[in-house]
UniProtKB/Swiss-Prot annotation:
Recorded metabolic or biological pathway in which this protein acts: Cell wall biogenesis; peptidoglycan biosynthesis
Species this protein is from: Bartonella bacilliformis (strain ATCC 35685 / KC583 / Herrer 020/F12,63)
Binding site for Mg(2+) 1: 253, 267
Location (main, coarse): cytoplasm
GO molecular function: ATP binding; D-alanine-D-alanine ligase activity; metal ion binding
Gene for this chain: ddl
Protein name: D-alanine--D-alanine ligase
Catalytically driven reaction(s): 2 D-alanine + ATP = D-alanyl-D-alanine + ADP + phosphate + H(+)
GO annotation, biological process: cell wall organization; peptidoglycan biosynthetic process; regulation of cell shape
Length: 306
């Protein structure tokens, strides 16, 4: 037994609740197998009093989406002086905001696609930029709310202006870059291997189903790329991680257009999924680490005020 009391936070109330429960359960299981004293907490509005009562040695943050990875729970844990995993308050808030994260990444020499941030209510019949482009909620993950507008399509107001839209009113409109889906993880200050994601033909892009359904996508790790492109993905992943101020593990996503040679950084994820079909465990395997190795490393890296 390690003697370390780890509370795993999962669930919550964001649109990524089910993914968080899967990540949290998997991580809690492996930590228990490694001898940690684990308590699983499905987060609700009583979380402050729950944490005050438990007073864990460490919190493993397996929450996804708003509240869990935008600086909110991180601020609570800082106030309670409980060491926690993954990025801190500022980096979490910045990374969750796709527009601001792109500005910071670009300032560090990371290649990004042209984009603009606006209210969804300002959209009209005319395209906000020349199609093809992508519309994304500014603060969502797991591809929730993503709309791709093709070259010959009209403005999809019915998808964005209807009453079923449950995401932020602020959106990002970004040039669509065709090509291969690439991702790369950073662990501390070490950049890991590059992985290519190949969604099954039934999926238009790497959406929620292709991410989380068993067999929804193929992970090729290490990716079959030229050494120049491979190293550029690694360089930009580390540059974004450091410029935004991330700690622990992060994962950056890219698009690579082989026809034009265009390599574009899309976003950084400070709370990457840790389910059985998640990317970080697969990337870890390529670097000689087991799933248990990486979960243990994340826990031992936990801290406050960093």
């Amino acid at each position: 037994m390690t003697g370390k009391h780890v509370t795993v936070l999962m669930g919550g109330w964001s649109s990524e609740r089910s993914v968080s429960l899967s990540s949290g359960t998997a991580c809690a299981d492996i930590l228990e197998a490694q001898g940690y004293n684990v308590v699983r907490v499905d987060v609700d509005d009583r979380i402050v009093s729950v944490l005050e009562e438990l007073r864990p040695t460490t919190v493993f943050n397996a929450l996804h989406g708003p509240f869990g990875e935008d600086g909110c729970i991180q601020g609570i844990l800082e106030y309670l002086k409980i060491p926690y995993t993954h990025s801190g308050v500022m980096a979490s808030a910045l990374a969750m905001d796709k527009g601001r994260a792109k500005i910071i990444a670009a300032s560090a020499g990371v290649s990004v696609a042209p984009s603009c941030v606006m209210s969804r209510f300002s959209l009209g019949a005319e395209h906000p930029m020349k199609p093809p482009y992508v519309i994304k909620p500014i603060r969502e993950g797991s591809s929730f709310g993503v709309v791709i507008v093709g070259s010959d399509e009209t403005m999809p107001l019915h998808d964005i202006m209807n009453n079923e839209w449950v995401y932020d009113d602020e959106i990002m409109v970004e040039k669509y870059v065709p090509g291969r889906e690439l991702t790369c993880a950073v662990l501390g200050d070490e950049v890991l291997d590059v992985c290519e994601i190949v969604p099954k033909e039934c999926f238009q892009f790497y959406d929620y189903d292709s991410k989380y359904k068993s067999g929804g996508s193929l992970h090729i790790c290490p990716a079959k790329l030229s050494s120049n492109i491979y190293q550029n993905v690694q360089r930009m992943s580390l540059a974004a991680h450091q410029a935004i101020g991330c700690r622990g593990v992060s994962r950056s996503d890219f698009r690579f257009n082989e026809e034009t040679g265009e390599l574009i950084w899309l976003e950084i994820n400070t709370q990457p999924g840790m389910t059985s079909t998640s990317l970080v465990p697969d990337i870890a395997k390529a670097s000689g680490r087991t799933y248990g190795d990486i979960v243990k490393w994340i826990v031992e890296d936990a801290s406050c005020m960093r």
